[in-house]
Amino acid sequence: MTTRYTINPSLRLCTWCLVVGWHEVKDSFLQSESIFSCEGRSIYTKGDRCMIMAQVNEKRIDFYYCHDTKFDNRNIQSWLRNIIKNKILDLANIELPKRLHYWEKEKNLYARQVIIKKMKRRNIWGQCSIYKQIFLPPKIVVFPLELIDEIILHEMSHLKFMHHRKQFWEYFSFLLGRDAKLCKMKESVFFAKYDEMIEFLLK
C-alpha cells in the first residue's frame, strides 16, 4: 500500500475525546467473540474467518486482532480507516458544537450557526462568515482541548472583527486571557507534527 501511514498497533491515538486501543488475542477468542453481535461491534472477515474486530464505544475504539492479522492488506487498511474516520466525524458533530456553545455562554457572544465541514484547504482550521456562521473542520476534534478552544475563540473574535488587524488581535487576546499571537506558534508546531496523519485518517 503506497502511503506514508499504515494503520496498525503502532498507531497511538489518545486524545481528550477519543482513545484507540489495540489488543492482540488468541485466534480462538477472536473467532468465538465475532459470532456474537452487539452495539458498536464490527468485524472484518476473510471467508468465514474473522481477521480483526472493532468495538466502538462513546469515546473509544478497541481493535482485537491475532498474531497473523495482515495489517498491510489494502482491504484491512480501508476497513480500519473507515472505522476511525466515522468515529471522528461522529464525535466532531457532537463535541465541537458543544464546545462552541460553552464558550458562547462564557463570553456572552453568539454565532448565528455552527457548521461542521471539511475545509477546502488543509491549513484552514476554522472560518467565520459575514453572516456570523462559524465553520469548523471535523479533524480538529482530536486536537488537544486547549488548541480547540483557541481555534473556537479565534473564530468567535471574527464575530466582532472580520479582519486580522490590531483590533482583532486585541479582542482575541481579551477573550483568550493571554497574548493571542503566541497561539500561532503553538498551532504551527502541532500542524507540522500531526496534521498529515489526521488528514490521512479522514480521507
Task: Name each model feature, range by range.
Residues 1-150, 159-203:
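Active-site-proximal or metal-binding-adjacent scaffold patches in catalytic folds
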Residues 155:
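Walker B catalytic acidic pair
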